[in-house]
Amino acid sequence: MPRFFARHAATLFFPMALILYDFAAYLSTDLIQPGIINVVRDFNADVSLAPAAVSLYLAGGMALQWLLGPLSDRIGRKPVLITGALIFTLACAATMFTTSMTQFLIARAIQGTSICFIATVGYVTVQEAFGQTKGIKLMAIITSIVLIAPIIGPLSGAALMHFVHWKVLFAIIAVMGFISFVGLLLAMPETVKRGAVPFSAKSVLRDFRNVFCNRLFLFGAATISLSYIPMMSWVAVSPVILIDAGGLTTSQFAWTQVPVFGAVIVANAIVARFVKDPTEPRFIWRAVPIQLVGLALLIIGNLLSPHVWLWSVLGTSLYAFGIGLIFPTLFRFTLFSNNLPKGTVSASLNMVILMVMSVSVEIGRWLWFNGGRLPFHLLAVVAGVIVVFTLAGLLNRVRQHQAAELAEEQ
């Protein structure tokens, strides 16, 4: 058994531990959402504080990006990620002992830092520890599994709270976090030489400046962040569109989200199982028409035959499938088609993505309340069309980088 563990630690148990950590982080929001009103009532707090459980979680996710990337470049990926898993576990456990809404929200913000550790350090380690094609396929598998959480989380949470107190849900998540912590401690490989670069404010600022001056990174960050807009704006505003304006029940609304997340899961499964080389430009360009057809359905369908949810869900799901086919490759290209410190590149990319997502959600919300469904969907269409041009720029820069590397080897 010890020999089997040693042989498969990096290739099997490390990805499993990371998936469990990522899955638990998602569940900490999705599992409690159906009972968030119960939380507010237990603490005799104002119901207007309910959305803060999500917004503060996201704020925690943005708080440490600037630090963790450069830090992991200098002291190693492993100590940073296992520290993050431990912090997440303790924050979930502490939630069981909260006695006020303020304490609960502080715990939620600390739990949100898991986004920083996973996205900035965990995903980079996967890409560094495995070859290009295997790394992309493994990330596709991780994404497929983790995206099950937004589908089953609310349904499972609602069912469990018929039998247990909401604090028990955080106990379950804390156990998952602890198991992932132990798994990462025992199985995570170290992909960075520790102490190779000293940690100083000057060197960190220099690294960030170099990243944001790199044109390949800028094209990659623009492509990825703009690609998120159609899905994230829909996920954020769809409750208002479908429940408040459309009259759907909460259970009906929950089922309308399944095709969107399910499309990404199916796309990632196809990449992991059937696509031999997901970095092939021809494969990448074949996914673009699928995205554009989905975006066209958002407008044309609602113009010709308006429906409460059909065209919006169908168009967004088709777009999600198309972009899901190439998302892992876009991340790989942006992170590794340069000679910059990967932790800093990952941190910079995540900061851009979160900023664009936040702004796009607010723009989408404004367009819906001031213009209605068609102006709201036009935001997705505009973002999707711009992505075609930024993707062309990214692939061109990647080709130049690969040609330069070949020339150096010869």
Curated annotation (Swiss-Prot):
Keywords attached to this entry: Antibiotic resistance, Antiport, Cell inner membrane, Cell membrane, Membrane, Transmembrane, Transmembrane helix, Transport
InterPro entries (UniProt xref): MFS, MFS_dom, MFS_trans_sf, Sugar_transporter_CS
Highest taxon above the source species: Bacteria
Membrane topology classification: Multi-pass membrane protein
GO terms of biological process kind: response to antibiotic; xenobiotic detoxification by transmembrane export across the plasma membrane
Molecular functions (GO terms): sodium:proton antiporter activity
Main localization of the protein described in the UniProt heading: membrane
GO CC list: plasma membrane
Pfam family, one: MFS_1
Family membership: Belongs to the major facilitator superfamily.
Function: Proton-dependent efflux pump. Confers resistance to a broad spectrum of chemically unrelated substrates.
Designated name of the protein: Multidrug resistance protein MdtM
Organism phylogeny: Bacteria, Pseudomonadati, Pseudomonadota, Gammaproteobacteria, Enterobacterales
Protein encoded by which gene: mdtM
